[in-house]
Design a protein with these regions (language model features):
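RNA-contacting regions in translation and RNA-metabolism proteins
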Residues: 1-43, 51-76
Length: 76
């Protein structure tokens, strides 16, 4: 799932080599922390958060099929 999220985010930004996704577990949930270049964060978040919302929906759907819980956070 980390690879899928990395692929999606790298496809959206101008500097894909500066994208990093880290994974951590907390309370039975996997949390993915996404970091991108300062100028690319807006592309990942989208207008009024629309793009990041859709990324979260997609990741939750994939996780649900595998019986897992996930969340996606955009880090500063």
């Amino acid at each position: 799932m980390k690879e899928l999220l990395t692929y999606i985010v790298q496809s959206l930004v101008d500097n894909p080599d500066q994208v990093s996704v880290t994974e951590r577990k907390a309370d039975g949930e996997t949390i993915y922390e996404v970091r991108a270049a300062e100028g690319d964060k807006g592309k990942v978040i989208g207008r009024q958060g629309r793009i990041v919302k859709q990324i979260r929906i997609l990741m939750r759907a994939v996780a649900q099929r595998k019986g897992k819980k996930v969340s996606v956070e955009i880090m500063d």
